[in-house]
Amino acid sequence: MSDLLSVFLHLLLLFKLVAPVTFRHHRYDDLVRTLYKVQNECPGITRVYSIGRSVEGRHLYVLEFSDHPGIHEPLEPEVKYVGNMHGNEALGRELMLQLSEFLCEEFRNRNQRIVQLIQDTRIHILPSMNPDGYEVAAAQGPNKPGYLVGRNNANGVDLNRNFPDLNTYIYYNEKYGGPNHHLPLPDNWKSQVEPETRAVIRWMHSFNFVLSANLHGGAVVANYPYDKSFEHRVRGVRRTASTPTPDDKLFQKLAKVYSYAHGWMFQGWNCGDYFPDGITNGASWYSLSKGMQDFNYLHTNCFEITLELSCDKFPPEEELQREWLGNREALIQFLEQVHQGIKGMVLDENYNNLANAVISVSGINHDVTSGDHGDYFRLLLPGIYTVSATAPGYDPETVTVTVGPAEPTLVNFHLKRSIPQVSPVRRAPSRRHGVRAKVQPQARKKEMEMRQLQRGPA
């Protein structure tokens, strides 16, 4: 009898581990169990890892999908989804759990589209960036009067207003000249941000992310950078001046891909507001400083948009299945957008990888860099481009590239070491005919002239 009971309990445990994700709200412990359940179902293509802890000590868990989990494969792009940045905006969290189960199940069912996506892409899913805030919101539940309860982290900070402000620097550089990518962090940045923000920034430093989406609630629209308005003039009710990035057309296309694959976002009229094509420039909607999507673009190689996915910030459980069906195709199509533009390796004469080489596209004032393995990824719309690769100590290389509408174009660069140019010593004629007087080097000459100016006329 005890043997039968043991077998029954084992089968019950096994059933709990492989049961599909249900359409309900998952508290922190449920979320963790769900992530490990998916890993148990698909151990060959998944990995659960933590990028840090929240203020109250909860792990910020990520579920990775890859045919080689835990390993970066050169020329395979990295893409991420971030959910539940605002603790009371719960739909993104649940969609990420449903997406995780869907990818696992469809891979096991040999759905060729999903198999190819996982073989060609390294996908990172962070269901909850703000688990502390979620627990506060979940304790209140949906349809309660506290609209903003649980929005912030445990220290009362809005995490989407907590990243270092790099927009101020890029707007200055665009006007007066300066770097157009990978803007440095302030020296004291760690003391200015919350633990959750710090963890995400370190996560960005650990992976060469190419594409990302940040899932929110309270509206239905695909929002693209910049979020912070360059001009603070108001152009209508709740509207400020549009502030496009150098990649504005590309960002619009990424936003439209999600909007038109979504069940109803593309219609424009949602939640009492109207957005043509279901998309908006962030600053055109309202100006937001220290946001995450602008930070991605200005500090890393990553192109991120913000997805507002539901009128209700914390929708009732009976709406979750409808929301999943409305977002499923859009979530997959957006992941597939990482496979466009150009990609390749940057190598030296001996075929060694060159990290941190700068890839520039003529006419687009935003560069990207090669990763630690020497591979780079540059999202571009179809067209003909002039592309250059540069690295300190090497001669630049420039090529003309045709980008098609489907797969990315492979463009490798082989950079040769620069040969130092030695300037010949210039000599001036002496005042005496036929005799040349030796002159000082240029730096010494300038120094003597400066001293003469300081002394004044003799």
From Swiss-Prot:
Any Gene Ontology biological process: protein catabolic process
Name listed for the protein in its UniProt record: Carboxypeptidase N catalytic chain
E.C. number(s) listed in UniProt: 3.4.17.3
Chemical reaction(s) catalysed: Release of a C-terminal basic amino acid, preferentially lysine
GO cellular component, one term: extracellular space
Note on cofactor: Binds 1 zinc ion per subunit.
UniProt family annotation: Belongs to the peptidase M14 family.
GO terms of molecular function: metallocarboxypeptidase activity; zinc ion binding
Function: Protects the body from potent vasoactive and inflammatory peptides containing C-terminal Arg or Lys (such as kinins or anaphylatoxins) which are released into the circulation.
PROSITE patterns named in the record: CARBOXYPEPT_ZN_1, CARBOXYPEPT_ZN_2, PEPTIDASE_M14
Top-level EC class as recorded in UniProt: hydrolase
Active site location: 308
Lineage start: Eukaryota, Metazoa, Chordata, Craniata, Vertebrata
Domain of life the protein comes from: Eukaryota
Residues bound to Zn(2+): 86, 89, 216
